[in-house]
Design a protein with these regions (language model features):
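Acidic/His- and Gly-rich active-site-bordering loop/insert found
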Residues: 2-101, 110-126
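Histidine/acidic-residue-rich, glycine-tolerant segments that coordinate divalent metal ions
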Residues: 60-61, 82, 89-100, 107, ...
Length: 192
């Protein structure tokens, strides 16, 4: 199955890059990301996932039900931009003065949507459920806590494990750095 997933990921690469660039051009700040959420919803359309939209934020959770009982895995991606101007000259540079995706959240969002595509094609091989959490307000707004306090995950199953990622310019393309437990900065306390 590993080779199938790798092949599928390669086939989704152009779609992932296109979504990332679309989000990059129209960055939104904080908890109110209507255009970003619309792009994500469009990207999830046609997939066999249950979509639960946050009412307190523009976040959402898409739930993929596996074919057999098993663990519930949450994959999380942040969606918000930063209040700074972009001066990169890129053809897909920010069109919003004073806002840009300088931290990679546009990539995180596109990769998470593509992961939903890829895994939904293999739902018959999955034991348990996969929850895809698209979170606004990571940059100082406490978006994850707001979504959790709202009960957005109660529509699915309590996650047995949570995974997130962050692009890192210090690593070469195609290289993944990982470790067990918390890493990088956090606005909340991690209990475990």
């Amino acid at each position: 199955m590993y080779e199938q997933l790798l092949t599928g990921a390669r086939e989704l690469q152009a779609q992932t890059v296109a979504m990332r660039r679309e989000i990059h051009q129209e960055p939104e700040l904080g908890l109110d990301l209507p255009q970003t959420r619309a792009t994500v919803l469009d990207g999830l359309s046609g997939l066999d996932v249950e979509v639960h939209q946050s009412q307190a934020t523009t976040g959402l959770v898409a739930i993929l039900r596996g074919a057999r009982p098993g663990p519930n895995i949450l994959l999380r991606g942040d969606m918000d931009a930063l209040p700074m101007s972009e001066d990169t000259g890129l053809p897909y540079a920010s069109q919003a003065p004073g806002r840009m995706h300088a931290c990679g959240h546009d990539a995180h969002t596109a990769m998470l949507a593509s992961a939903a595509h890829l895994l939904s094609e293999h739902a018959q091989d999955i034991s348990g459920n996969v929850l895809f959490m698209f979170q606004p307000g990571e940059e100082g707004y406490g978006g994850a806590k707001i979504m959790l306090d709202e009960g957005v995950l109660e529509a699915g199953e309590k996650p047995d494990a949570v995974f997130a990622l962050h692009v890192h310019p210090g690593l070469p393309s195609g290289v993944i750095g990982c470790r067990s437990g918390p890493i990088l900065a956090a606005a909340d306390t991690v209990h475990g």
